[in-house]
Amino acid sequence: MKTMEFIPNTSQTLRIMTHNVWNKDENSPQWELRGEDCSASSRVGGLLRVYRELCPDVIGGQEVSALMADLLKEGFQSEPINYTLIWGRFTPIFYRADRLELIDSEFGTYPEKIQGYDGSFNDVKSKSWNIGVFRVKDNGALFVFATTHLWWKKSPECEDDLSKSHCQVGSDEARTQQISLLLTKLDEYRGKYNCPAILLGDMNAGYHSEAMQTVRANGFRHAHDIATEYAEESVGYHFCFPSGYQTSYYNRPFESAIDHIYVIGEKEGAVKRFERYSPDYYFPISDHSPAYIDLQL
């Protein structure tokens, strides 16, 4: 594990986070056999610890079930920061109302069907987006914030073996269409408020994928590419599933990471740090490490 130099956020800096917390409400038999518990009620304490240690100003969630959202809201009441919730089906937003004022918001789910391809590309309606427009109370700066979770299955290697549960032809195209819908929506909000925007989430797509190239073609820049003080090179991912978990993080290049943070319209040099948080206690909490940026507006 990387030894992290924690730099707290200041009144001049916003800490913006994306976090897939793992949609797992109940314990699994495999964990129970090991005397462990992966239920939401067991894991919420680890999530609260992450937020207590990092103090993000905005958290864009993915795989946040209704139960987990309730548990987090209950837990926040006893924490140093009592985050305010903007509801969204599996993609809620939590924000610091002491620092930020909510100006506007909108939530939506992606279509289940993709023209030209069979099957569902949003089978449990968890693939969605959530937008919040915020005003920074200290200086009046506005920004648009969007969290999203794109379709998860793979497609290029599936052409000759569709029996694999993680394969579905058209999945790459689905992600590109999904993110294109959100980019259009963000254009509307940026046009309305004339301010920077932050787009983040679990994209289920690597840096060089068609979906992520589409984001950059629309003018967004990856925080990793423009951070002036520190840019994380790890992927922030490890094995943590109903069958169990492992106590090591995957050693893969940054380009293969699927949790991304993009910005547009910010001042040059505004993104100071792009990081992932992967402490040892986090192994049984979620397969995705939270990623965050420090941003000056």
Describe each region flagged by the PLM.
Residues 6-8, 58-153, 275:
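Structured beta-strand-rich core segments of catalytic domains in phosphoester-bond hydrolases
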Residues 20-21, 148-150, 202-203, 289:
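Active-site metal-binding loops of divalent metal-dependent hydrolases
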Residues 18-43, 111-123, 151-174:
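Acidic/histidine-rich helix-loop elements
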Residues 128-148, 160-203, 208, 212:
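His/acidic metal-ligating clusters that form di-metal
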Residues 1-4, 187-198, 204-297:
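Metal-dependent phosphoester-hydrolase catalytic domains
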Residues 14, 57-58, 143, 196-198, ...:
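Short, Asp-centered acidic motifs that coordinate Mg2+ and/or phosphate
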Residues 1-74, 297:
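N-terminal, active-site-proximal structural segment of metallo-dependent hydrolase catalytic domains
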